[in-house]
Curated annotation (Swiss-Prot):
Membrane topology: Multi-pass membrane protein
Alphabetized GO MF terms: carbohydrate binding; G protein-coupled receptor activity; mechanoreceptor activity; transmembrane signaling receptor activity
Name this protein carries in UniProt: Latrophilin Cirl
Modified sites of kind Phosphoserine: 1142, 1239, 1246, 1315-1316
Biased composition (Polar residues): 171-184, 242-251, 1625-1637
Amino acid sequence: MILSKYQTAYACEGKKLTIECDPGDVINLIRANYGRFSITICNDHGNVEWSVNCMFPKSLSVLNSRCAHKQSCGVLAATSMFGDPCPGTHKYLEAHYQCISAAQTSTTTNRPSPPPWVLSNGPPIFGNGSGLIHPPGVGAGAPPPPRLPTLPGVVGISGNPGLFNVPPQHTAVTHSTPSSSTTAVGGGRLKGGATSTTTTKHPAGRHDGLPPPPQLHHHHNHHGEDTASPTKPSSKLPAGGNATSPSNTRILTGVGGSGTDDGTLLTTKSSPNRPPGTAASGSVVPGNGSVVRTINNINLNAAGMSGGDDESKLFCGPTHARNLYWNMTRVGDVNVQPCPGGAAGIAKWRCVLMKRIPDSGYDEYDDDISSTTPAPSGGDCLHNSSSCEPPVSMAHKVNQRLRNFEPTWHPATPDLTQCRSLWLNNLEMRVNQRDSSLISIANDMSEVTSSKTLYGGDMLVTTKIIQTVSEKMMHDKETFPDQRQREAMIMELLHCVVKTGSNLLDESQLSSWLDLNPEDQMRVATSLLTGLEYNAFLLADTIIRERSVVQKVKNILLSVRVLETKTIQSSVVFPDSDQWPLSSDRIELPRAALIDNSEGGLVRIVFAAFDRLESILKPSYDHFDLKSSRSYVRNTAILSNDSDVNAGEIQQRLRILNSKVISASLGKGRHIQLSQPITLTLKHLKTENVTNPTCVFWNYIDHAWSANGCSLESTNRTHSVCSCNHLTNFAILMDVVDEHQHSLFTMFDGNMRIFIYISIGICVVFIVIALLTLKLFNGVFVKSARTSIYTSIYLCLLAIELLFLLGIEQTETSIFCGFITIFLHCAILSGTAWFCYEAFHSYSTLTSDELLLEVDQTPKVNCYYLLSYGLSLSVVAISLVIDPSTYTQNDYCVLMEANALFYATFVIPVLVFFVAAIGYTFLSWIIMCRKSRTGLKTKEHTRLASVRFDIRCSFVFLLLLSAVWCSAYFYLRGAKMDDDTADVYGYCFICFNTLLGLYIFVFHCIQNEKIRREYRKYVRQHAWLPKCLRCSKTSISSGIVTGNGPTAGTLCSVSTSKKPKLPLGVSEEAHDDPQQQQQTPVPITEDAIMGATSDCELNEAQQRRTLKSGLMTGTLQAPPQTLGGHVVLERGSTLRSTGHASPTSSAGSTHLIFAHKQQQQQQQQGPLGESYYHQPDYYSWKQPSTGTGGLKTPREYYNNAGAAASSPQQAHEVFYWTQKPNSGHNGKKKRGAGGVPASPSGSLHSRTAAASQVLFYPSYKKTKPGQPTGYPQYAEALDPPLATGNAAAYYQQQQQLRRQQLHQQQQQQQQQQLSSDEEQAEQHAHLLHLQRRAGSQQQLPAPPPHMAQYQQEFMQRQYRNKHSNCDLGMGDAYYNQGSVGGADGGPVYEEILSNRNSDVQHYEVGDFDVDEVYNNSVGTGVFNNMRAAVAAGGSRYGGGSLSGGSVSSRSQQQQLKKQQQQQSLAQQRSARRCTADDDDDEDEEEDEEATAAEQLHDSVCDEDEEEDESDLEDDAHGLPPQSDERMRRLMAMQDEDFKRRFQRQLRKHGAPLDYGALPPGAGPQPEHNGAVFGVSGGVGEGSLRGAFRQQQQQALNAKSPGGRLAVNELFGHGNSGPPLPPANQTPAQKRQQLQKLSPQSTTSSSSHTSHSNPNPHPHQLTHPHPHQHPPHHQQRHLSAMLDENNTVRCYLEPLAK
């Protein structure tokens, strides 16, 4: 049943009271009174002499006769109608009524609706709207009215039945006893017979017929101060209009002593799980879903509750409170006794019965009580004897029902309203005298209130004296003719009054306020405020010129300002920042409002700020302290009016005053309207578990807070801004939310806060890793627009995460809070913009030529930067200009206030960017679908697959980021509004944000094979990482790409250990059969390359597969008799797939790629079981096979050196290679085909298939400008038998030509001089912008006669290779021959300038040390031959013979003789250099290896030490000093292992080591500068030095190239390098300085050139003279790198800055 609105009407004496209801409703009066209960109602002049205990008993009857059950009525409030209950007092008529439906009037059993403090679901804003007060009840008459709210069914108050007149109700006689008759009225309240019509107030003895109470032993404390527990109320319930019954409270009445008038307060916790059918039998009261259940018809006397231990539950135990001893008191009685010493009057305290049930819910006895039915009368028992029970059974049942109730003193403290101190009574008498000194009285009053203990009555007296003093001073001031004296007197009086008011508000007087009932507290507070205001305006009216007076005491700041209107230029603000440090509240009065209220050109304003007044002017539960009220609300509940509705569903709001009270008044304090509203900023006292702020003012008439005329402008967690159109005392009301049921987070509480911190931390870590990856491994990628876009996205996301983390810890008052919100706004807009541009970039890539080649597009990226950050900053700037406060008005520092500006500048731009990103993604998918159906070349399909993968991942990234931001937004909004779904959104945010960080790491780091390899390399190269990480197989590169066919690029071996895991394509039978296993290809696994990539040892129980150096197109064959027991791939020889970094170089190192049509000649397996390929110049030499199809043994090889001695072979480096499987016509990658894993290549995060490639890993030195581009033909290299007769002569001719070229280059270098380093930096290779490869062919010249026997295909490949390799002398016709993986046209290169200094690493590779001296029976000439063979670029060891027998010629002998001479000269130079170098390091001079090298090799003085087999830590093998220690140790270990295996192979096969015959080109090679580009430098395992140094090093005295190939070595021989700019030149002044400073300068980056070398090497073109070449940092080197588009890029090293 819907409860009608409870209303109150007033009419002053002589006026007409009109009550009117809506059509269809009638008036239902609840109570009425004609008289006066409030001093403020109908008191325009502030008269305080009127009586406030004035009442007419028949007021309700008179009003009922005129208005009951009518739609409207009017009653004149006059004594002629009601009589004159208090002559001399101006009276008013007060009526409390409801408008109910006319249909309800036919039900006569309905009881009147209870007052609003029981029925209202929400408290009215007027705290005590009725203004009703209870009479003091002095004397031995009737006791005072109860301080409990009047409950339904109240007939009257004993001894004063006319206080509230209730309409008669239907009653029923429920039980009769001989001693008394008890009538139960509508509410279940007991009305005793004639023998018990008065309330006992005799503490010593009882006169109600009950025996005296026994001595009790209480197990609980009944002390008043201790009752404010979580399970007990701490104070009394209010009787005011807005005093609401606590939520979760059930008021039960009807249990009490015989003759009591107001029953007992029984509260229980309702159960939400009440069994069905347990309907309450108590009366159902119409009204707003509330029900009051009553215990019907329980007569404790009749029930036999008159003795024994059970009676202990019906008495409150004795206790001490307020300096009084309170004896045992029966439940329902009021203990009355005189006031404490020094005070006059009486003190009272009531004993009530109260029950608490735990939160577990339903209690069985609660159902027993609520379901009790009235006992049938005697007549009914005759007709229905089954319902009659004997008295003993009734007593037992009552005892059971009441056993969980306990008696409690209520309220928490006694009522001392009538207690007045003697000294304040004296002051009251003095102030009423005619000639009293007001200043003296005011001083005495301030002294008494600060030093004496006050009681409740003293508060009333003090505020009355304050008002009386102000009224008398108003009349007395006219007696002072002097203006100064008048102002001084009033100012002194004001100071005393302010001090007195501060004393009353002091914490020491809190008990005095608690002595008053809630109504008296409000009345005293109102009187105090008006008294202060009257005295302040008394001073303001006295001042006749502009002046400001400030009175500041402990708890009150009062300011009186008199301003001239002509001086008011702006709004007036109170208080000043330095006046009131207790609070940050402020009030601002607009200038127009002040001018409108001026008088005589002056504006008089009174401001006041109060401390601790908020604890007095409580809107509800004023008799509770805050802690107790929260506890009380949390543990109690209000029941629903319907019996089938679970109890506790309707929860009452608890409102508190959540700010200090601040006041402003104009016009002598009158309630005037202002032309412009004032602005108030009030700080919240409580920021947690509060919500719904309301701006209110204190209504003097109603003694309550009201919101009329005030509105809330904005609010956040700590402050609220209000606007009011009038002046008075202002504050903020807020609802308290039960923190046990609802968690309104400070930001995030408990686990939620911890989880959010963890989530943000994880995301930030992964974003930082992604950013560092892009920065540190930037050489992995070709710098592109996509890389820049994702870098910007990561930066924005990082800023968002960090700002969010900082913002949740800030308060809205801090300046930092606004900045966080501003920057977060900008970061979110920028991040969404970058996502949009990323989608647009993918779309533009698909619709333009960018699909084929993605390079750095600086103009486009700059445009992206401008649009993203420019637009974001512009939008934020516009938002700041429009309304800066929108960034500081929200509850949290991470959100803007949700207003129109928020949606216009934040929501709409974000949605636009997201929609645009999704739109471009959709268009990109459409284009990709179309392109996939068309015939594209392999490269286009590769790029298309890359873009497809990018779009997929980006779309998922966008969706995940949207989920993160949406969940965060809804969580913050829900937390602010205390929404139950806030936790759900919070945990969604935690999950999504964590997934976002993981996705960034996996998608942009782990998913990319290039980055994975760099991670593994980083792990292996840092010794501080755990051994398990550096030795795990997961740290070894798995990017093995086999060649075309099922057996290409595989390794065959026999394993005698346990059966390994069979690779794909290998049958189990083949594995079990040793012979078949010999021929079964085994794909190269990670185990096979572990030795080349880490220093980890494998399980010694298994045989290891050994892969030696070699270069071949077919299968790498390793016989069963593998050596060494270790799997070792030589340094620099790890198989890599297309586009991957070389094993011993950093990211972005050089790669050279050949077209797959250039079929290299596969080498057969020789007797040594080694497979390798010897290709000195990479294009012109083909190893002929023997009759058996295999290479000759090392013995045969060295015996066949007759013609090879003068062969023009160039020193070279042997490289491994591999091929990717053919991707087919459509370029689509077939995963798992043939069991060959395909490694990814491509763009930043793509995984695509590339065309079949042959991959090399050289590093190059730049050549000098002016070198011819021709490539000489070496017939000796192609067919050694043809070169038998002229090899030596031809070689001598070549050496002579090189010496001439060297001389020319020296002259040119001395003459050239650049004007500045800037010009020098500009001399770089030009970028060749290549068009699409059209496949055009260039006519080949006729081959030389000695090569006519070879096939056309071989000659075509040989010729084109000589004209490729970044040859700048060629035109576009050559470069447009075909794509990389296309026709037989050779590779296509692009040459660009590398500005990344991180890609360039210079090492000294010309100087070597010798680790041990070989003392076998080998002559010096043999070692010379070995050294010459090494210098000539022979295979690693016994690489095969080029001829069929042992041939020796005169030219060869002469060449060997020259080698011996050069060796002796080199030894002398080495000794001289050692002398100079020994000054730097004397310890190394004594080293055994250095001593041996000093005798046998010209680079013996290299400062790098090499550790032996037992001690690897000192073995650096001449490694570059710049390399890290881990790589030095790794390479040293591999060199040692190679040496051991080589020696074992020689001893095993019994090789006599006859080095009389050497491979072609084994003549002496001149030294060259070894500064190279790459990590491994000249000591790479694929280098010359690594091949033969184990045995031949002792005889290696001549300079050997030792390093990776120079450009002219790779591209041609002699003067056949590509023409490059003179980037290696320095100005003449610098060269002269260098010559002066270092006449014998040798740097770590340059080799030493022999003056006496008759056959200078072409590499000397780089540094023609040892004293003239510039320092190492001035050298510039050329390198080639395979980009993500499978195109070789030649990089020219930038000059050092």
